[in-house]
Regions:
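Arg/Lys-rich amphipathic alpha helix in sigma70-family domain 2
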Residues: 74-81, 91-112
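Amphipathic, Lys/Arg- and hydrophobic-enriched alpha-helical face
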Residues: 40-58, 75, 90
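Structural recognition of an alpha-helix C-terminal capping motif at a helix-to-coil junction
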Residues: 49, 63-70, 83-95
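Active-site phosphate/pyrophosphate-handling residues
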Residues: 23, 34, 46, 67, ...
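Helix-turn-helix/winged-helix DNA-binding modules
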Residues: 31, 52-53, 80-81
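A short, glycine- and basic residue-enriched loop/turn
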Residues: 44, 58, 62, 76-82, ...
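Intrinsic, short, N-terminal disordered tails of RNA polymerase sigma-factor systems
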Residues: 1-30, 34, 38-41, 106, ...
Length: 118
């Protein structure tokens, strides 16, 4: 069992290796939809895991994951290889998750205020 888990972890590290993701980012910046599909395939678990760790809600984490890849598609031309492509993508997902949490807080505050008015 431990060997299987170690193998899976190694496969995940290999799938998100910067030397594999960098060319995808260049293709993505050129509008290559297949590059987006491959980037999604290689990084979706990491992006979803980060979103879920912030949001603690599967539905919201799925929304943030989808939105992160949409933003990556729209802004790939702005990617600068100062870090890794995965770090860039996770930063997008983190920012979207934080926005979702702030939005959730405002909604809850409004509902509480409405409740107190009754």
């Amino acid at each position: 069992m431990l060997i299987l888990l170690e193998t899976m972890a190694e496969e995940r590290r290999t799938a998100t290796a910067p030397e594999l993701l960098e060319p995808l980012m260049a293709r993505l910046a050129g509008g290559d939809q297949e590059a987006l599909a491959e980037l999604y395939h290689r990084t979706r678990t990491s992006v979803y895991g980060l979103a879920l760790s912030y949001l603690k809600n599967q539905h919201d984490a799925e929304d943030v994951t989808q939105d992160a890849f949409v933003r990556a598609w729209e802004n790939a031309h702005q990617y600068r290889p100062q870090g890794t492509p995965l770090a860039w993508l996770l930063t997008i997902a983190r920012n979207l998750a934080l926005m979702k949490l702030r939005e959730r807080g405002r909604t809850q505050d409004m509902a509480l205020e409405d409740w107190e008015r009754l």
